[in-house]
Swiss-Prot record:
This is Protein PHOSPHATE STARVATION RESPONSE 1. Residues 244-269 bind DNA. Residues 345-368, 388-405 have a biased composition (Polar residues). The keyword Manganese does not apply. GO terms for molecular function: DNA binding; DNA-binding transcription factor activity. It comes from the Eukaryota. InterPro entries: Homeodomain-like_sf, Myb_CC_LHEQLE, Myb_dom, Myb_dom_plants, PHR1-like, SANT/Myb. Induction: Not regulated by Pi starvation. Residues 213-273 form the HTH myb-type domain.
Amino acid sequence: MSSSLPILPKSLKDIPRSHNTQNILMPGQLPNDSMPLHQSATQSSISHPRASVVRSSYSAMLGYAANPIDSVSSHEGHFMAAPFISQSSNAEMLQYLCNNNTHGGHTVPTFFPAPACGAPDYMDTITVPDNHTQSGSSTVTSDAAKQNEWWADIMNDDWKDILDATATDSQSKSMAQPSNSAASQPAFNQSTSSHSGDICPVTSPPPNNSNASASKQRMRWTPELHESFVHAVNKLGGSEKATPKGVLKLMKVDGLTIYHVKSHLQKYRTARYKPDLSEGKTQEGKTTDELSLDLKASMDLTEALRLQMEVQKRLHEQLEIQRKLQLRIEEQGKYLQKMFEKQCKSSTQSVQDPSSGDTATPSEPSNSVDKDSEAALDPNRIGDNHPKNSTNVGANLKTAATESPDSPVIATDGSELPQEKRRRVHES
């Protein structure tokens, strides 16, 4: 590539240059860097050897020493900050403006116009004291023609190579700057960029989610659409089981999206279950009242059941007592029956034993005979004892006749009476 930069216009060539004008730094520096002139020049000479030749020739023509350290030592009292330039890969010309007729302060803007797209323009100014400005304005030499020739010598292929080599570094640094750096540029940078003729495309920010949602098409739900929607929901098993995707597949309506179906399904659910919720509240109130009544009734029932259980328990105790008494009565009856049977047996035994009665009857008459004999022997007692003895004899005869009717009757004198007499005795 053997293209060279265009030469400055004639109006710029006629501008006088003073010997006290500051050196111009090479591109590739950041705008906020406050590095002195000799440091930037040393760095640029290290990175680009050809640039050092250009800078030394330019310094010689302006009256400075070739050594950057000497230049700084001789002029470090005349300025506060070093100038900076802004460059781009497609720079078309080099512009240098100098105003030496100011009093009280002198600013020299140095920059490269025509920035690339997305790379901001940076520029810094040089503040020069009054005495230096006056001395620079008074010294106008006849080296203007040589300076014009110097500009022609600089604009060659070497200068283009230097710009191309540093273009990539400046672009990478400029892309890291925030987007609002373009708004903070001075007005004269904007004017120079307009003269360069470059057009930078302005990228608009991405649309927000609100704009995207606003761009969605709204849909009016007609009664026919709602009926088909309800039919699809019922097919899927109700509003709780239905999904927007399934409803959309069943409806098959052009222009209907899943967002429309989703919103309508939510509205359908809320509208359907809202009255049910109010009814549920009233039902809950009724159920609470019913529960309270049920609790009271259940308490009454439990109390009644408890009383009934107590009564049944008492009845059971009474039945147990009655059963025990009945057992005792049965035992006593059995005991009495045994006693009665024993009495009957004893009576039958006494009746069935006649020998005991026969032995007793003859002894009694003998005793009575003895008594009669004694009475007969005692005359004093005859009158008194005679009726008694007679009665006793009669009684004895009767008992003997009853006990043994077949037995012979014995007379008072001890002789047996005949049967006829026995009958008479019995009849009497």
